[in-house]
Amino acid sequence: MSTENTLSVADLARENVRNLVPYQSARRLGGNGDVWLNANEFPTAVEFQLTQQTLNRYPECQPKAVIENYAQYAGVKPEQVLVSRGADEGIELVIRAFCEPGKDAILYCPPTYGMYSVSAETIGVERRTVPALENWQLDLQGISDNLDGTKVVFVCSPNNPTGQLINPQDLRTLLELTRGKAIVVADEAYIEFCPQATLTGWLVEYPHLVILRTLSKAFALAGLRCGFTLANEEVINLLLKVIAPYPLSTPVADIAAQALCPQGINAMRDRVAQTVQERQYLVNALQQTACVEHVFDSETNYILARFTASSSVFKSLWDQGIILRDQNKQPSLSGCLRITVGTRQENQRVIDALRAEPV
């Protein structure tokens, strides 16, 4: 047998996958901490009891109780809801449904969430960036100049990692600019911390608007991997063509339905109030800490701050078992670290450690 033309496994892989730098999730970055403030999770676990034991049967593709409960919570019709393995799968589904690899592009506005880029690159879709303005609002002219060939525009509001809301008038202008040209995806992963800012009421006006949601943040279920896509029925039907046949396991659907019952939603709102209170405590303390240059406003469960020596601060806290998220390499975020709001005890440990840093 000739071996002249044999290829290695790496050679057999698609070129874009060989060159791909995977998303550096908080867990992938690792660390041996006991204070985990790097992934925007809720700091304590919520207990659930499984009520569905029929694990010998395949689950529903779109579990009825989960869809109906979420639709009622979000104020939309069940036909406007799709549930998936986290909002990350929703990102991928939209790109797969609307973008032709090698032809179409997505557009996003850094500094922002990294999975828009990674998902597009994995699928083989061009990525275009229009950096946010100095105040981290949208550069509408820059976006307008890049719409030819762009099929999907991703906007995160509140934005991760900066924490601020996108100006609603700018969002409306964006939706008008893209009408008949591109899908606009509003990532509302953190909307429970500022529910008044949701765009769900705009779905009736904009057939090309898609909204991403998750149970990972305010619902304290990051380990469940359950997210939602809200859109008009025509969009949902297209996404249903490309989603896996059984995206949610029976236990995940069981717990999600419980979390979305009235009692679960009330508990979520209590957690939000607790988080907002702790966020203010942390902001006040950071503003009185010598190694902190600036604390940015936040509408979320995390705070972005600029430090006089962020790399050494990050490593020093890491060595003490306090794991933060380094944002230094993001555009316009030099010297910045992101701190998830933890328990009072965790927040105090962060402040004590920061105040012990040499200035």
Swiss-Prot record:
**Do you know which InterPro entries this protein is assigned to?**
Aminotrans_II_pyridoxalP_BS (IPR001917), Aminotransferase_I/II_large (IPR004839), HisP_aminotrans (IPR005861), PyrdxlP-dep_Trfase (IPR015424), PyrdxlP-dep_Trfase_major (IPR015421), PyrdxlP-dep_Trfase_small (IPR015422)
Pathway per its UniProt entry is: Amino-acid biosynthesis; L-histidine biosynthesis; L-histidine from 5-phospho-alpha-D-ribose 1-diphosphate: step 7/9
Q: Which UniProt keywords apply?
A: Amino-acid biosynthesis, Aminotransferase, Histidine biosynthesis, Pyridoxal phosphate, Transferase
A GO MF label? histidinol-phosphate transaminase activity
The Enzyme Commission number assigned here is 2.6.1.9
SUPFAM superfamilies registered for this protein in UniProt: PLP-dependent transferases (SSF53383)
- One of its Pfam families is Aminotran_1_2
PROSITE patterns (UniProt xref): AA_TRANSFER_CLASS_2
Tell me the protein family, please: Belongs to the class-II pyridoxal-phosphate-dependent aminotransferase family. Histidinol-phosphate aminotransferase subfamily.
What's the subunit arrangement here? Answer: Homodimer.
Q: This chain belongs to which protein, by name?
A: Histidinol-phosphate aminotransferase
Organism classification, top ranks?
Bacteria, Pseudomonadati, Pseudomonadota, Gammaproteobacteria, Enterobacterales
